[in-house]
Design a protein with these regions (language model features):
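Active-site environment of divalent metal-dependent phosphoester hydrolases
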Residues: 1, 18-22, 46-47, 92-96, ...
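Hydrophobic/aromatic beta-strand patches that form the interior of the parallel beta-sheet core
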Residues: 13, 37, 57, 86, ...
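Binuclear metal-ion centers of metallo-dependent hydrolases, dominated by the metallo-beta-lactamase
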Residues: 33-51, 98-103, 122-179
Length: 179
């Protein structure tokens, strides 16, 4: 709530959840007249227009890791200036195929390091994710990288099969990219 309170926000989207912090956020937004949408099965695949040239679609997917199966999870598809971008967050790539975006020409797909690894192994990811750029995010900072994700991503960049991909690893604080 500190971030929302200190920056101008025109609207917020977040998964519907009965957890107290989520309810407190909704209360906070109502008091400040900031529009918000709690995403649920009833909003799945709805497309929102956010200005003249921006569209947002959120669709539910399974969260990665059996211990998180009850955690509400969504992917975000954002369209702007004729480009399509997908944020997969912690989608369960072992069971999801992302058929929702099949046939979509993605400018960029944002995947976490584990999903990035799975893109190279059809035994792990059974779908197709075709994008001009694969942006690897959720890479831990050096001091937090107990599972050596940074090194794993770095090695995969030069492994067989990666030569045809345009990969943008996002691993540094405040790092910016241009698509």
């Amino acid at each position: 709530m500190q971030i929302v309170g200190s920056r101008p926000a025109r609207a917020l989207f977040f998964p519907e959840d009965e957890a107290e912090p989520v309810q407190e956020l909704a209360y906070f937004l109502r008091r400040r007249d900031i529009p918000f949408m709690q995403l649920s099965h009833t909003t799945d695949h709805t497309v929102w227009r956010l200005g003249e040239h921006i569209r947002l679609q959120a669709f539910r997917t399974q969260h990665l890791g059996q211990e998180f199966y009850e955690v509400p999870h969504v992917c975000y598809r954002i369209s702007f200036d004729g480009r399509e971008v997908l944020f997969t967050a912690d989608t369960d790539y072992l069971h999801e195929t992302l058929a929702q975006i099949s046939g979509t020409a993605l400018e960029a797909a944002f995947v976490n390091p584990l999903f990035f690894q799975a893109l190279f192994d059809k035994r792990l990811f059974h779908g197709a994710l075709e994008a001009k750029y694969i942006c690897v995010y959720h890479i831990p900072f050096r001091e937090d990288d107990r599972m050596h994700m940074r090194e794993s991503v770095r090695r995969r960049l030069t492994a067989p099969g990666a030569e045809h991909l345009r990969v943008l690893p996002l691993s540094e604080p405040y790092q910016q990219i241009k698509l």
